Amino acid sequence: AMDEISDVMTDFARTLQLEGSENFVRLDPVDLTVVIQQPGGRVPLSRMGSAENWVGYHLVAHLALHRWFCDKDRPVPRFVMFDQSTQAFFPEEVVDAADDENADWEAVRRQFALMRDVVANLDGQLQIIASDHANLQDDWFQEGVIENWRNGVALIPEDWLDEQSSI
C-alpha cells in the first residue's frame, strides 16, 4: 500500500513541479512526515525549504491518500477541505489575489488543475472544497466556483456575528 501511495505522491509532486520531485517521494509512517529519497539519503519535509514545498507536499500527500482510500473502497469520508493552499504564491496578505502581479499564477493553476484531475479521475468519488484568495479566470476553474466571498458576502454572514455578540 505504501509503495502505491508513494508512486502517486511522486507523480503528483512532479505535476506540481515541487523542489526535489525528481526523486522518489514517500510518506514515512514512523515519523508521520513526507520524505524525499535522494541518492545521498532521505530528506524530511522539515528540511525541504520553501513554503511552496511545504504546502505542495501536504497537498500531494492528502490527495494520494484519498485516492488510495477511494480506490480500495476504505471507510474514510470522501471529502477534503483545503484552506488557502495557494498562500505560498502570494508575497503579502491579499484580499483579492486576482490583482496580485507578483503571484506565480502557473503554479497556482497547476495546484488547482491537480485537484480537478484527481476528482475527475475518481469519477466524483471525492469532493474537494477549496477556500482561497486565488480566482483563476479559466473556464474549468470558474465552473467549480460555488461562491466568491467578497464585498460583504462571506461564509459566515455578518448578521450572524451581530446576533452572537448580543447573547
Predicted regions and their residues:
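Walker B catalytic acidic pair
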Residues: D83-S85
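Conserved catalytic network of the ASCE P-loop NTPase/AAA+ motor domain
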Residues: G49, D71-R74, V118-D123
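Flexible loop/turn segments at secondary-structure boundaries
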Residues: V43, Q87-F90, L136-D139
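Extended, charged coiled-coil "arm/hinge" scaffolds of SMC/Rad50-like chromosome-maintenance ATPases
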Residues: A1-G41, K72-F79, P91
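Metal-dependent nuclease catalytic cores in nucleic-acid-processing enzymes
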Residues: V60-D71
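C-terminal lobe/lid and adjacent interdomain/linker elements of RecA-like ASCE P-loop ATPase modules
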Residues: V95-I167
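Hydrophobic, Leu/Ile/Phe/Ala-enriched alpha-helical segments that form helix-helix packing faces
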Residues: I5-Q17, A64-L65, Q111, M115-D123
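Conserved ABC ATPase signature
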Residues: V35-H62
